[in-house]
Structure formats: C-alpha cells, structure tokens
C-alpha cells in the first residue's frame, strides 16, 4: 500500500499524536488532512495496520489491510473520496461537522458526481442525504430513488440514534438524534453499553422501596442543598446558605417546567440575582472561558463561546432537540449529555452557564423518568468530587477548536470571533462526556445517596437513644452530634464543661459508645446489588 495522489497518509506523528509504526491513516482523518478542512481531527483516528486483527483504543481504530479503502492512483479524486467515505460511514460512524465542511469544500456539481458513483447504493444514498440535509440544497441531476429499501442515515450499532423519519427522495430514514441546528452525536462504546446494561433506574426504584417515605423526603432535602452548594463550588463560589437553598429548591423542580429559552433565562436570574454589573438574557457580545494576561489584559481563552449572532439559532435547535429526545426512547443519560454539555459549549449567557448546564442534567433525567420525581439526583456533588476528569472532558472539545477559531481582542479585553463557527457548537462528538456522566450517575447511586440515607438512619437511631435516656431537646441533640463528629466520637473538654455540663462522666461514656455503634462501626458505602 503506497502513498497515492489521493488520501492515504503515512506519518510517524499526526495531529499531535504519535502513531504506531507502519500504519496508514484512512477515512475521515485522511480526508481532513488531504483537503485541509478547517476542523479538528476526529477523536479516534482510523488506521490500516500490518496486523491481522481489528483493535480499537481510545485514540485509534486499527484495521487489517483487507479493510483498506481503494485509493489507487489510477482513480480520480472523487472516486477515491467516495471509497474513503464508505469506509468512514461503515466503521467510524457519521461525523456531521466533517460532512458540513466537505459540502462547502466541493461545489454542487462535484458532490453530485460523488453521489452518482453508486446512485442507488446504501452508502451513496446516506452521503447524498447528509449533504442535502446539511446544505438545504438539492444536488443537480440526481433524481429521487425508487424501488429500493429504506436505509438508516446513522448506523445504530455505532452511534445512539432516534426513531427517525423517512426521506422519500433518498429512501433514507433520518434517525439523527437532533435537528439541523443542533445535533451532537454519541458513539456506542463498551463502557456505555456496560453502563446501560446496569439499568440504574430500575435498581434505584427497588432500592428506595426499602426506606421510609419520611426518611427519603429528609434525604432529598439534604441532597438538594448538597447538590446546590456543590454546583456553586464547581464555579469557585461559596454562596450564603439562603442563596444555596433557593437554588436547591430550583433543582428540586427540575422536569416540572418545559425547557425553553425563556425558562433558561428565568433560571439565569435565579442563579445571578443581581443585574447591577451584567444584563440577563442571551449574550450580545462575544464570550470565552479562561484568563486575562495580568499585564496587558489580553484574553487567554481555554474555551471560546458561540458568536452572539448565532445564539438564537443554536438555542432554538437545542430546545427543539431537547423536546425530540424527551419523546424518544433514547437513553436518558445520553440525552442529558447531549443537551447539557451542548448548552455549556454554546455558553449563551454572560454568567450562570455552568450551574444551568448542571440543572439541565437534572431536567433531562427527570423528564426521561430516570430520576424519581421528588427525590433529587445529586450529580453536581459527584462532579465536584471528580473535577479533574470533568475539566478534562470539557477541554477535550474546547481545546482542539481553538486552532480553528479566528478572533481579535475587543477594547474591553473580550473576544470577537471573525470566522464562521456555528457548526462547532451544533455538531459535536460527546462520547467522552456521556461516559463521564454515566460514571457520575453510578457514583451517585453507589456512594452519595447511600451515604446520606445511612447517615440519617444512624442519626435517627442515635436520637431515639438520647430521647429515651435524657429527654434532650432536638437542637441540643444536633449540637451533640456535631461535637462528637468533630471529636471523632469523643466529646471535647470544652463541651463537657459548657454545653453538656449537666451530663455525668458515665453518661458521657454511654453516649460516646452509642455514637460509635451507630456512626463509626458501619460502612457508609453501598453497592447496587444485581
């Protein structure tokens, strides 16, 4: 397999990654490299290897030589391109950002020539459909297909899809899980399939049936506050208790109100509260996440937000896709990933995006009936405990795009984007984000919720003992527990001499023993049983 005049690409290093020796880049990455398309290389690069077996890693898709697309120098460019596209659709799935840029690289006549190679073939029809769906234009000279079976636009074995609608012109079922203005995709991976098979939603229902309703309500109240504080902490804020409690109440209502742009603006007002230094609503200027140079004030972006002129279209697409996913049987965590992480990348507001992004996770899980109505799912608390992974996942999309966004500094040290970037925010690969969110879901059900329920059970048992022996006021019992927690089960000398001076030494020993029995000798870690 030699270098040709077309798309095969050999290099020891490619897009900042070291490649295994003697391997040839094919598919999407090879086309992007050859044509110079202004988009990042896909997360996983397809390679033809001297080996005899397929092997998939987080970075590479390795295929034996028998899988190589025909890229013979005798072929013209369009025919070689078609062969690589067939390979890509068959093994890499649909890449909407790629097809959007490919459709603007070639003129309509060249694209029609591409489709005409096998006008009734399933891959040709899928390519044709994607081009016309993305451009909104009909390719010249291509007649409607007839007397053929319908084929799926997206292979559901490779990526998560929706039920779909028929496109009679192409004889293609459009099962893309989104709209033209917002359609992130998620690949099916072994990790995601494993998570889905664990069926957390059903196991949750069975587990919670074993607890008193009163205990669940109290746990939900504590978890609301915990999640609210965690969401602020993720943003580096330490809100007063009242503010955290108000946002916690809002989280508790997730799924009860329809998701609209106006609803998101209402949530922003609840998050920010004070309009003195900023305007509520969609941004009217550029935006970025990052720092400023301490001397010049120049922006140092880690993420560049969508252009203000694109926000209305992007948000309409996001809302419409949210409604589509709500009604479709697509997995709830995958749906939450697409809408919530899509929102935070768009970054439609000047401030409050992060907390609203995490609210959207709650909303989608609630409307998809993954989380139980009235019982909070404290996903922010788990995210806070996994901040390094969270930041890595977010940077996975943002960082590669920085090389393809042209911008200039504004007089107020903001960013003004100069090129067309809307596709970067509507056609994303959110596979790592779905895996991360599933990890947080698992952690929440395996650790955070059980710890809270175990703690409240222990507290109630300890309180019953104190009530039966000392008839102590509830507020004083709460204070006693606080002191014992701080003292690792021992009451401090100060507490003995001041707040609990009425207790005798033998009574204190009994209390400490009862505390240890309930709080210190029980594991607070619980795992969902099969």
Language model segments and positions:
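FIC/Doc superfamily catalytic core
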Residues: 1-350, 355-530
């Amino acid at each position: 397999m030699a270098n040709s005049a077309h798309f095969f690409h050999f290099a020891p290093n490619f897009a900042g990654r070291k490649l295994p020796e003697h391997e040839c880049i094919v598919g999407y990455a090879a086309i992007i490299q050859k044509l110079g398309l202004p988009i990042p290389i896909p997360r996983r690069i397809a390679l033809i290897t001297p080996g005899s077996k397929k092997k998939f890693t987080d970075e590479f898709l390795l295929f034996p030589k028998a899988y190589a697309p025909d890229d013979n120098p005798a072929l013209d460019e369009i025919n070689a391109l078609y062969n690589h596209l067939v390979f890509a659709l068959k093994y890499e799935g649909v890449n909407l950002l790629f097809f959007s840029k490919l459709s603007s690289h070639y003129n309509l006549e060249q694209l029609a020539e591409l489709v005409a190679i096998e006008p009734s073939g399933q891959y040709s029809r899928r390519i044709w459909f994607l081009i016309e769906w993305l451009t909104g234009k009909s390719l010249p000279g291509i007649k409607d297909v007839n007397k053929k079976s319908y084929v799926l636009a997206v292979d559901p074995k490779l990526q998560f899809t929706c039920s779909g609608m028929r496109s009679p012109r192409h004889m293609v079922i459009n099962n893309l899980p989104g709209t033209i203005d917002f359609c992130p995709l998620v690949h099916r991976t072994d990790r995601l399939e494993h998570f889905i098979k664990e069926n957390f939603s059903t196991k949750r229902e069975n587990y919670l049936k074993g607890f008193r309703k009163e205990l669940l309500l109290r746990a939900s109240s504590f978890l609301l506050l915990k999640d609210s504080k965690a969401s602020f902490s993720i943003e580096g804020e330490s809100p007063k208790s009242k503010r955290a409690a108000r946002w916690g109440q809002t989280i508790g209502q997730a799924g009860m109100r329809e998701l609209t742009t106006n609803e998101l603006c209402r949530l922003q007002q609840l998050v920010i509260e004070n309009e003195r230094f900023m305007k509520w609503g969609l941004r009217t200027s550029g935006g970025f996440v990052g720092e400023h140079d301490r001397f010049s004030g120049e922006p140092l972006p880690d993420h560049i937000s969508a252009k203000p002129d694109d926000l209305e279209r992007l948000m309409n697409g996001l809302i419409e896709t949210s409604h589509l996913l709500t009604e479709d049987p697509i997995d709830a965590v995958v749906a939450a990933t697409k809408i919530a992480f899509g929102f935070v990348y768009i970054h439609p507001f000047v401030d409050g995006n992060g907390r609203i992004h995490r609210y959207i996770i709650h909303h989608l899980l609630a409307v998809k009936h993954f989380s139980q109505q009235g019982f909070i799912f404290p996903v922010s608390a788990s995210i806070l405990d996994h901040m390094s992974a969270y930041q890595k996942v977010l940077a996975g999309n943002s960082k590669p795009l920085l090389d393809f966004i042209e911008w200039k500094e504004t007089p107020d040290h903001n960013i003004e984007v100069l090129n067309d970037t809307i596709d970067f925010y509507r056609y994303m690969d959110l596979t790592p984000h779905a895996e991360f969110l599933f990890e947080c879901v698992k952690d929440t059900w395996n650790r955070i919720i059980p710890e809270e329920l175990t703690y409240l059970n222990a507290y109630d048992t300890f309180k019953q003992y104190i009530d039966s022996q000392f008839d102590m006021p509830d507020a004083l019992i709460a204070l006693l527990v606080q002191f014992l927690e701080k003292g690792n089960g021992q009451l401090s000398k100060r507490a003995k001499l001041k707040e609990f001076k009425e207790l005798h030494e033998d009574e204190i020993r009994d209390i400490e023993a009862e505390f240890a029995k309930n709080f210190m000798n029980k594991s607070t870690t619980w795992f969902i049983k099969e």
